[in-house]
Amino acid sequence: MKRVNVFRSGVFSRLFALLLPFLLGINGLVYASAEAPAEAVHAEAAAHAEGGHESAGDVIMHHILDTGVMSFEPFGEVHLPQIVIGGFDISITRHVVMMWIASAILLVVFLLVGNRYKTMTSRQAPGGMANAMEALVEFIRLDVAKSNIGAGYEKHLPYLLTVFAFILLLNLLGLVPYGATATGNINVTLTLAVFTFFITQVASLKAHGIKGYLAHLTAGTHWALWIIMIPIEIIGLFTKPFALTVRLFANMTAGHIVILSLIFISFILKSYIVAMFVSVPFSIFIYLLEIFVAFLQAFIFTMLSALFIGLATAHEGHEGEAAH
């Protein structure tokens, strides 16, 4: 089988062209839905801490929810700027900072790998980061995009690569010290799902035209059943992004709650035995499991996005094939 260099075939240039506006769009939409209740939770937790009555639940919620304060215990904390324009709170939060960091990492990595491929000859083999990136691109290209979308998958490959790398980095940044899991913010996961939703609908319109797109809402049934089928099909359009939103949000939030709960068991019971044989071992196990889940959830979101695009663009004679 002939090996295709996706970086030299133009996929990389389209990926980079999509990356910056995609990331800026994510940040902008999350700005517009900043979580004011999270600030109240942080203020309440701080008030309890001053009085010495901070509960385990307050600490867990403070670590899970988005706030305008980045904690660097025991060195202190950084209060992020609060910005209100025209009555809209677009304050910078720690989840936004995490998305900035992930965006910067992606841009640097893609630039370095792109420059590396520009200086390579056709006989040279990629090494190090370039080799890892090529393996990742080939995996998404063949096992995710091509297998689920089929013909015309190339035009959707840059988006799928971007969303996979972005979600993966956000998941992993939530596992490092002083980090925060932006994918544990339902505003972030909803925004990602909205991107997939609009790309899917636009792809369907291009593949079938307006007439074919509207005909799909009737599911090929007799006109007498349209009053039933059309609402069902419309609901079905929105259940897909809803499933993407909740799946990623719930999985990334649950793991952190479990880890924090296990750690607090030893403090609640005030037992070194519990800490040594329950809290620490199980927390380490869940933490390692979270690393696996970080990769798994990024893959699932990307694969489902490709599957939805494939189902939306498949012609009637190939729908069964796309579904498989």
Swiss-Prot record:
Keywords of this entry? ATP synthesis, Cell inner membrane, Cell membrane, CF(0), Hydrogen ion transport, Ion transport, Membrane, Signal, Transmembrane, Transmembrane helix, Transport
The stretch of residues making up the signal peptide is: 1-33
State the compartments where it is located: Cell inner membrane
Q: Which GO terms describe its cellular component?
A: plasma membrane; proton-transporting ATP synthase complex
Q: How does it sit in the membrane?
A: Multi-pass membrane protein
Q: Where are the transmembrane segments?
A: 95-115, 157-177, 179-199, 224-244, 257-277, 291-311
What molecular function does GO assign, one term? proton-transporting ATP synthase activity, rotational mechanism
Where it mainly occurs, coarsely classed, is membrane
Q: Which domain of life is it from?
A: Bacteria
Q: What does this protein do?
A: Key component of the proton channel; it plays a direct role in the translocation of protons across the membrane.
Q: How does it assemble?
A: F-type ATPases have 2 components, CF(1) - the catalytic core - and CF(0) - the membrane proton channel. CF(1) has five subunits: alpha(3), beta(3), gamma(1), delta(1), epsilon(1). CF(0) has four main subunits: a, b, b' and c.
Write out the similarity annotation: Belongs to the ATPase A chain family.
Output this protein's name. ATP synthase subunit a 2
